[in-house]
């Protein structure tokens, strides 16, 4: 699996991203900028009819109502990362609620360590739920600046698709060339990443 991640990192390093002039966001980032970047996460046939959220003073705020069950926003695994994503309805009922909680806590000044522990406790108590069925998260934009767990550094990452895989690990999907990469392995919000053979910019 490490070889898979290394290959993805090399692919990311070789890309020229038009989005690299903006590689992080916070509550002070203009709403119109956040909306535009959030819409890059998925095809316009989805984002034109999705709920759109922006990061505000107290966490995420719904600024555009949709009708197709998708929710698009700029997620931040860490305050320094930037991950435009569009969750389907299943993700909106489960994983996305955790993401909302995380940003609400950050807005209150809670430490990252405390937030992580609260999320773990929330899953254990049933406050938070893992996805109960298969589904997809779009992350197709050029604005993906993610944490490389191997190095602790933030890298630019190519557009990709993610599929819910609660508690999945390398043993679940196999290892070696061609095997998908698992984000948050063994956790309720684990995701299986698939990078299209010719990942393309989704800038509209």
Residue ranges and their predicted role:
Residues 2-8:
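Sec-dependent signal peptide recognition
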Residues 21-204:
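Primary mode marks residue(s) on the alpha4-beta5-alpha5 output face of response regulator receiver
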Residues 9-18:
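Hydrophobic h-region of N-terminal signal peptides that target proteins for export
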């Amino acid at each position: 699996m490490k070889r898979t991640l290394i290959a993805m990192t090399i692919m990311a390093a070789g890309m020229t991203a038009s989005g690299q002039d903006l590689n992080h966001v916070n509550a002070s980032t203009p709403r119109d900028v956040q909306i535009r970047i959030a819409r890059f996460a998925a095809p316009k046939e989805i984002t034109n009819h999705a709920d759109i959220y922006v990061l505000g003073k107290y966490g995420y705020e719904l600024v555009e109502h949709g009708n197709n069950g998708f929710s698009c926003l700029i997620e931040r695994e860490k305050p320094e990362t930037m991950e435009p994503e569009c969750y389907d309805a299943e993700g909106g009922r489960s994983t996305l609620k955790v993401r909302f909680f995380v940003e609400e806590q950050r807005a209150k000044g809670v430490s990252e360590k405390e937030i992580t522990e609260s999320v773990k406790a929330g899953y254990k108590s049933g406050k938070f739920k893992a996805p109960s069925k298969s589904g997809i998260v779009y992350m197709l934009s050029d604005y993906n600046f993610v944490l490389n767990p191997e190095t602790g550094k933030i890298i630019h990452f190519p557009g990709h698709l993610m599929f819910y895989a609660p508690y999945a690990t390398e043993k679940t999907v196999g290892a070696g060339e061609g095997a998908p990469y698992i984000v948050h392995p063994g956790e309720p919000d684990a995701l299986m990443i698939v990078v299209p053979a010719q990942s393309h910019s989704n800038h509209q």
